[in-house]
Each structure stands twice: as C-alpha cells, then as structure tokens.
A protein has these predicted regions:
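N-terminal binding-site loop/beta-alpha segment at the start of enzyme catalytic domains
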Residues: 1-76, 138, 220-221
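Active-site beta-loop-alpha junctions enriched in small/polar residues
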Residues: 21-23, 49-52, 81-85, 117-120, ...
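Beta/alpha (TIM)-barrel catalytic core signal, keyed to glycine-rich beta->alpha loops juxtaposed to Asp/Glu
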Residues: 124-253
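Short, acidic/polar
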Residues: 26-38, 91-107, 153-156
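Active-site groove signature of glycoside hydrolases
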Residues: 104-125
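Generic structural signal for well-ordered alpha-helices
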Residues: 3, 35, 58, 62-65, ...
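Active-site mouth loops of central-metabolism enzymes
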Residues: 19-29, 82-94, 123
Length: 254
C-alpha cells in the first residue's frame, strides 16, 4: 500500500483509508475478517464517524477489534468525526466532548489518532471548539484534529482560535466530482467549470499543508450511486477497463 504524508509532515499513513460507513450490520466474525483483510493489504487507516449506522459501525468494529488478541491498537490509525445531529450541526464544546467520549467507548479505545469536525456549523463559536480541542488534546483522547466539508474561510475562522493545527479536510472528490481541480483549469473562462464553489480550496490546503481526503471516491454527483459500470459514464468506464486489463487488476483498483 502506498503511503502519503499527513498534514505538515506529521506522519505517514496509507493513501487509501478504509471507510467504515456501511458496516453497521456486519456480524462480529464478518467484521473481524474485514479488519484482517484490510490489514493484510497494508490498509491500517480506518475512517469512522459517530453517525455511521447510528453509532453501530463503531460499536461492531470496536467489539471485533477488542475481542481479537492478535490485533494491536498501535498497529492501526483510527479517525472519526462528530458534529452532525438530527436536523442540525453542532460544534459546541459540550457536544464535541460528549461525542468523543461516545466514540472512544464504542471503538473500545482510549484515544483517537485523528478527529474531524464533520460539517460546518453556521452558528459555531470557535472559542468553544478551541476549548474542546484543548481538553481532548491535553487528556490524550485525541492526538490530531481536522475538518470535513469546510471552505477556506471556515478553516481560517477556526484556526484563529484553535491552538492545534487542522491537518485534514475531508471533502467529496472523485473523477465525476472533480470541480476542485477543474476550477483551476478554467480560470478566466466563461464556462460553468470556471465558477469556484469552494473558495480555491485545493490551493488553500496545499498552501497550508492540509491533507485533502476524498469521501465516496466512486460516487456520482447528486448521490446517484457508483459511477463504475454506470451507463451515464460509458467512455470513462471503457477507458478504466482498458487500463485495468493492461495491469491485470479490477476496474475498481484503477
């Protein structure tokens, strides 16, 4: 598994994180097999969130991991997210601290390697986020922090108060959802792609050593499902298949 540098040379992590959103209905045995299969491929970076499966994805993962003595906490990198509540987003100090305690309990661990704020809270009080992060960092419950789905100025606002560097921004990115790159190629053009919806997010993150993570990298725009094999992208799928055959791997691998 290839590795990439996280943030400003914090450490190396696998280039592919194992998404755990749809694992809530797995049995303990199935989850154990899932974890071992990932580790055998060098994929030791697991991405969770407190809302995945209503918390069950973390619970099943944590139970399977804790019950297998061959699995060691120091051999994996655990990331989770908080801030989404029923009907609104909440980045208050109280909610962040309560959420992390729940995450740690469900995952059967005493620390997270990385905590992300899942969505921007339009009513956020950045001082509360800073206070929560200080408590989590100083107690050893969270080692590094980041965000998800945030624009540059939202990150700037948080970073004005938060002492710890925000090292990750997880956003939707895939071949069909490639506006982060396309915007930069259509500057000063009268085309739909020239409209910058994200505030030069790609350039901002590169300038500030913030690692961009892609969520749902196989997904089409507007939550239409996977683009692999879709009739909406015949030329793309044909090209992917040609490349996959060349290297004797699956289209998904490419």
């Amino acid at each position: 598994m290839r590795e990439t540098i996280l943030g400003n040379n914090i450490r190396k992590v696998p280039s592919v994180a194992v998404g755990c959103m749809r694992l809530s209905e797995k049995s303990k045995n199935e989850m154990n097999h899932f974890i071992h299969a990932a580790l055998e491929q060098g994929a030791y970076f697991f991405d969770h969130a407190d809302i995945y499966g209503g918390g069950m994805s973390e619970s099943v993962f944590g139970e399977a991991f804790a019950d297998d003595p061959s699995l060691k906490r120091e051999d994996i990198y655990l990331q989770s997210k908080c801030g989404i509540r029923q009907g609104f987003y909440d980045l208050s100090k109280e909610h962040i601290l309560k959420s992390v305690d729940g995450i740690l309990k469900r995952l059967h661990t005493d620390y997270l390697d990385l905590l992300l704020l899942h969505r921007p809270d339009a009513l956020v009080e950045p001082e509360e986020v800073a206070a929560a992060f200080d408590v989590l960092f100083e107690s050893g419950k969270v080692r590094h922090f980041g965000v998800s789905n945030h624009k540059p100025m939202q990150i700037e606002l948080l970073q004005k108060y938060v002492r710890q560097p925000l090292v990750v921004n997880q956003v939707q990115f895939s071949i069909p959802v490639s506006n982060l790159v396309a915007n930069g190629m259509e500057v000063n053009m009268e085309t739909p792609g020239s409209i910058d919806h994200d505030g030069s997010l790609l350039d901002y993150c590169r300038l500030h050593s913030i690692t961009l993570q892609a969520w749902s990298p196989f997904q089409m725009p507007a939550w239409k499902g996977c683009f692999l094999g879709s009739d909406e992208y015949p030329e793309l799928n044909k090209k992917l298949h040609v490349i996959a055959e060349k290297y004797n791997v699956s289209d998904t691998t490419i």
